[in-house]
């Protein structure tokens, strides 16, 4: 029972709509009505500006990071292969990612999984996150497309999981990668049409 509570709590924390709350609290704006209509970090930068964008990014990363440690902090017991699987920090983190993308507080319409996924990886493998961040910002510098950089970094995460033989990370990264591509499908279409907006701060 405690494992179920832990996973629900992880989802609810992940579902906290940082961009929406910051927009409403400090700018009196519903971020869903501006830009891409997304509540995540990228749209927060576009609509609310750099300081708010960085704050939203931090909060979204923190959501993923903090829940990874729930199996250590909460009184959960793994007594078999199934409970062991669901008390793995990566699996707990995956529920936070689902919450971020499909938040119950906003009618299940949230962000695109990038920052919260980064927080989960930070909690379980900081070195891998550094490598993925270098790839992300390298692609971003060359293309100026956040969406493309995110997709390529997610593919590299799958490859990295195989190289280090972390098979739970492999499973989670494939799931998140598919989710990320689904959430960025309109961005992909706009890239091919040459209509995807490029960042201007790099």
UniProtKB/Swiss-Prot annotation:
Q: Which UniProt keywords apply?
A: Cell membrane, Lipid biosynthesis, Lipid metabolism, Membrane, Phospholipid biosynthesis, Phospholipid metabolism, Transferase, Transmembrane, Transmembrane helix
The record's annotation in InterPro entries points to:
G3P_acylTferase_PlsY (IPR003811)
Bilayer-crossing regions = 2-22, 54-74, 88-108, 120-140, 141-161, 162-182
GO cellular component terms attached to this protein's record? plasma membrane
The disulfides recorded in the entry are: none
Tell me the compartments it is located in. Answer: Cell membrane
Single GO MF descriptor: acyl-phosphate glycerol-3-phosphate acyltransferase activity
- The Enzyme Commission number assigned here is 2.3.1.275
Indicate the principal place this protein occupies in or around the cell.
Answer: membrane
Pathway(s) annotated for this protein in UniProt: Lipid metabolism; phospholipid metabolism
Q: Does the keyword RNA-binding apply?
A: no
How does the entry describe its membrane topology?
Multi-pass membrane protein
Q: What does this protein do?
A: Catalyzes the transfer of an acyl group from acyl-phosphate (acyl-PO(4)) to glycerol-3-phosphate (G3P) to form lysophosphatidic acid (LPA). This enzyme utilizes acyl-phosphate as fatty acyl donor, but not acyl-CoA or acyl-ACP.
PANTHER family membership: GLYCEROL-3-PHOSPHATE ACYLTRANSFERASE-RELATED, INNER MEMBRANE PROTEIN YGIH
The record describes its quaternary structure and partners as:
Probably interacts with PlsX.
UniProt name for this protein: Glycerol-3-phosphate acyltransferase
Species, as recorded: Staphylococcus saprophyticus subsp. saprophyticus (strain ATCC 15305 / DSM 20229 / NCIMB 8711 / NCTC 7292 / S-41)
Gene name, Swiss-Prot/TrEMBL: plsY
């Amino acid at each position: 029972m405690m494992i179920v509570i832990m996973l629900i709590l992880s989802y609810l924390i992940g579902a906290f709509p940082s961009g929406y709350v910051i927009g409403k609290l400090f700018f009196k704006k519903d971020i869903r009505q501006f830009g891409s209509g997304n509540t995540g970090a990228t749209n927060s930068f576009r609509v609310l500006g750099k300081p708010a964008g960085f704050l939203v990014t931090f909060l979204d990363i923190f959501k993923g990071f903090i829940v990874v440690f729930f199996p250590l902090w909460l009184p959960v017991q793994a007594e078999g292969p199934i409970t062991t699987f669901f008390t793995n920090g990566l699996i707990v983190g995956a529920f936070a990612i689902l919450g971020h993308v499909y938040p119950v507080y906003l009618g299940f319409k949230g962000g695109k999984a990038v920052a919260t996924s980064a927080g989960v990886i930070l909690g379980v493998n900081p070195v891998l996150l550094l490598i993925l961040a270098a790839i992300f910002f390298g692609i971003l510098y060359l293309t100026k497309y956040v969406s493309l950089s995110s997709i390529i970094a997610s593919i590299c995460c799958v490859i990295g999981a195989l190289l280090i033989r972390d098979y739970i990370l492999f499973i989670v990264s494939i799931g998140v990668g598919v989710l990320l591509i689904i959430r960025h499908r309109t961005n992909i279409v706009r890239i091919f049409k040459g209509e995807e907006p490029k960042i201007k701060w790099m």
